[in-house]
Structure formats: structure tokens, C-alpha cells
A protein has these predicted regions:
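Hydrophobic-ligand binding "helix-grip"
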Residues: 37, 44-46, 50, 59-107, ...
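A conserved amphipathic terminal alpha-helix motif
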Residues: 114-157
């Protein structure tokens, strides 16, 4: 069973989801380009090591870019985040993902900090859209075609 919880603070989005998959499997969905595009993006270039750069075409029109800041295999990933075009520039915000074993699954805790105003609202919507897709893909399912790749992206991104 997949369960979700969420909260928003002054400058951060916090989401928690329990996924029926091991931390090792879920880690791969953040570090392997072929796995990433199953839940987020149309193409991805990832160099998952501290100082390594990533570039993900998230919607077919909007490209996220940043740098991996910390990698602890199967436990924690921290990376900078921003958009190649738009008010939230690459490196201006930070995403932290924690993978915590939980019985036969994993508790995924995500914190995206450094956001404000419309950018905060847009990223709340973004993570609410993408984390359920991650849950399906990591558990071995098919989240289907991402509707965000077929139309205009949400405002503020």
C-alpha cells in the first residue's frame, strides 16, 4: 500500500510517501536516467556523484538542472534544483530525499527548500504530481504517459 503525507513551510515543500519497494530500487529512480524518465521527464542526463550535474527535460519544454551535493547510496540524495528558463534558476533551491526502510517497503521523505511565492505553489503541485508516479514506477507498475508532457506546464515553473 502506498501512503502519502505532506506539509508546506515558509520556503519548503515537504512530502512523505511509503512505497512498496526497497531503498535500493527507489534510489535507482533518482540516479538512473532510464528509470527516472519512467516517472519524471522525457529525457534525463544524470551524473549521480557529489559535484555531478544533472539535466532533466521535465515536461518536454521545461528543463530542470542542478548539481548533486550529497549522495549516500540507498539512504540519502541532496541536489540543487532550478530551471534553465524561469525565475527559479539552477542551483537556487535544494532538494533532499531520504530513503528509510519500512517493513517490506520504503518511506521516502522529500524536502524542497529555498522556494517562495508562486514558485513554492508550483513546486507543491509538481511534487504532488510526480511522487505518486514514482510510487507506481518503483513498485513495478506503469504510471502511464505523463499528461504534463502533452500540454502547457503548470504556472510558476
Amino acid at each position: 500500500m502506498t501512503t502519502f503525507s505532506s506539509s508546506t513551510f515558509d520556503d519548503a515543500v515537504m512530502r512523505e510517501v511509503r512505497i512498496e519497494a526497497s531503498p535500493e530500487v527507489i534510489f535507482g529512480f533518482f540516479t538512473d536516467p532510464e528509470k527516472m524518465i519512467k516517472w519524471k521527464g522525457t529525457e534525463a542526463m544524470l551524473d549521480p556523484r557529489p559535484g555531478g550535474v544533472y539535466r532533466v527535460n521535465v515536461t518536454g519544454r521545461e528543463v530542470a538542472r542542478g548539481e548533486y551535493l550529497e549522495i549516500t547510496p540507498y539512504t540519502r540524495i541532496v541536489f540543487s534544483w532550478g530551471w534553465e528558463e524561469g525565475p527559479i534558476t539552477p542551483g537556487s533551491t535544494t532538494v533532499e530525499v531520504r530513503l528509510i526502510p519500512d517493513g517490506s517497503g520504503t518511506l521516502v521523505q522529500l524536502r524542497h527548500a529555498g522556494l517562495s511565492g508562486e514558485g513554492l505553489d508550483a513546486h507543491v503541485a509538481g511534487w504532488e504530481h510526480f511522487l505518486p508516479r514514482l510510487a507506481v514506477a518503483a513498485a513495478g507498475g506503469d504510471p502511464g504517459v505523463d499528461p504534463w508532457t502533452m500540454g502547457p506546464p503548470p504556472d510558476g515553473q
